[in-house]
Curated annotation (Swiss-Prot):
Its main location: cytoplasm. It holds the Pfam family IGPD. Gene3D superfamilies: Imidazole glycerol phosphate dehydratase, domain 1. It is found in: Cytoplasm. PANTHER family: IMIDAZOLEGLYCEROL-PHOSPHATE DEHYDRATASE, IMIDAZOLEGLYCEROL-PHOSPHATE DEHYDRATASE HIS7. It is an enzyme of class 4 (lyase). Keywords: Amino-acid biosynthesis, Cytoplasm, Histidine biosynthesis, Lyase. CDD domains: IGPD (cd07914). Belongs to the imidazoleglycerol-phosphate dehydratase family. Its EC number is 4.2.1.19. This is Imidazoleglycerol-phosphate dehydratase.
């Protein structure tokens, strides 16, 4: 089983995160950031990843450190759980609509961190959650998963729908990239021989 548990403690946050990449989409989330929990549940459900997160952060200041550090921890756990990347598809992509909103996410588990994020949210916050933190979450993830990630919210009028399509599409793209490629067997999906 491709699993990992990360404990990450700083002066700002204490996070314990477990991931099972071959799960069924179960999520047990206690982050202190309700909207983020709703989005993380989308990653688990649509990525068929079991995700357990307990986070204690300085949310009395704001949600920034907690959101960013959960992204970092998820990236670290994914990198550890995926291992040497032999036999995986490596690339994944997904378009996801939700009513008027549509997002596209493309991922490459390349070993090269990079985020291209384009989302013009129609509101600055969703129920107290700053929409700028969506990019912060994914920046933390890409840096520590060592993945290249392109996220485009192509349209939308409702900021909640915009964010939700991004997280759902991310889960589905990640699921595709992590799938076993029987034709690759124990080979790395790269002509370089290393990822």
């Amino acid at each position: 089983m491709r699993q990992a548990t990360i404990q990450r403690n700083t002066l700002e946050t204490k996070i314990e995160l477990s991931v099972n990449l071959d799960g069924t989409g179960k999520a047990d989330l206690n982050t202190g950031v309700p909207f983020l929990e709703h989005m993380l549940d989308q990653i688990a459900r649509h990525g068929l990843i079991d995700l357990t997160i307990k986070a204690d952060g300085d949310t009395h200041i704001d949600d920034h450190h907690t959101v960013e550090d959960i992204g970092i921890s998820l990236g670290m756990a994914l990198k550890e759980a995926v291992g040497d990347k032999k036999g995986i598809k490596r690339y994944g992509h997904s378009y996801v609509p939700l009513d008027e909103a549509l997002s596209r996410v493309v991922i490459d588990l390349s070993g090269r961190p990079g985020l291209v994020f384009k989302a013009d949210f129609t509101r600055a916050s969703i129920g107290g959650f700053d929409t700028e933190l969506v990019a912060e979450f994914f920046q933390g993830f890409t840096n520590h998963a060592q993945a290249t990630l392109h996220i485009d919210c192509l349209r939308g009028k409702n900021a909640h729908h915009q964010a939700e399509t991004i997280f759902k599409a991310f889960g589905r793209a990640l699921r595709m990239a992590l799938e076993a490629d029987e034709r690759m067997a124990d080979q790395l999906p790269s002509t370089k021989g290393a990822l």
